[in-house]
């Protein structure tokens, strides 16, 4: 009985079978009946298909469908050889929330990886056009700015540079407009918190770009100078002019006016355009007396007019006078202090009001050496200019005209008294003068040149000729015998019929060397009473006589 009972198989309870079926259905696919899992738990790994919206496993997916799950860092990304790129399920962010070598933050990389394919498509469309990283850190002032900033922030999250596009362009190079989700934007002009304003606030701005485009604020392009200084310059010039024409309009008109060619620095043209100090002072005083408001503006007259330094000797004198709002100076000091308003201000300084900003410089300065400008900016005195003319050619021509006219008119007066009274002239028409000044009185021995009457001769002082004496002084009919006698008295062109009476009384000769002969030995005594030469007009040049 017992054997038969053991041979008959026991029928299982149907309740137990139902419990086993329900237990199998709750376990994962790869989980055996004993409940021990043979694979790793992947619930901490986010599902990359779920992030792209293409996961078909649903609840049976072994990966996490939570966007807040913190992913581990991909070790291949740290090595730089991850083959999955933005499709990798692991995190491609450096530890410590630092920035990547290309300047992209880890938060941006995380958002790119979260967006997956959409981020890669947006990156391909936008190239490397990055938005300012300070966009999200700006504090908005009104709700409209907040609404505009959210759109710009979304665009920024999708347009950051990806390290997996090595052939993308640099941030500074962009091509026109880009399209994101059917919305037109302008690269590199998405606004920050300061410039995100409406179009009405940019009516008086000098920008030529619209301030908003399809709801996205656009910043104005950078100016040549700071916007504050440029607006101050425009407002100051508009106030002085009494109109709406600003500083830029003045500069454009000054380039096209009739004085444009006179602004080009040339040697003869600059000499010809220079005016005397007397005319300059009178014109400036007339300007300040008629309209004191225009005195603070850049002068539109010929640019050499404000220079009023009177050159009386080699060290130039500085003349500082205050006429209304004008501060007058001379020479290189005025050029260093006056703010420049156009490209010719370095060569020809103009008087500008101190109320204008000193950083307004829209053009480059002319590349002209200081030595040339110092020569060109040396003004002539009214007396020297009236006699010698305004240019070197005019000087020579005027002197030659005086010489030729003197031969026809005996009554023509000489230029200076020392010209006719000087004993240092020769038949070549040049004045021989001292090339150096002897300090102190000294004596030297020399052999007598020839016997003479009363043992006294006049000797030339040197062989250097002055510029203003290239043409000799006018010789009248009354002074012609005296000049001939003077030529005969010179030792170089001496004749035996010379007498000391012919050279007596012609002028003060105490500064010239006098030779007194005593028993075949002559002694030259030089007095130290020579006045300093006026070096403003006269320039010494070497003189060479032909055989």
Swiss-Prot record:
Signal peptide: none
UniProt KW Ribosomal protein keyword: no
Post-translational modification Phosphothreonine, affected residues: 502
PTM-bearing positions, type Phosphotyrosine: 344
Bias (Basic and acidic residues) ranges: 10-21
Pfam families linked: zf-CCCH, zf-CCCH_4
Zinc finger (C3H1-type) boundaries: 41-67, 68-95
Coiled-coil blocks: none
UniProt-recorded name of the protein: Uncharacterized protein C1739.01
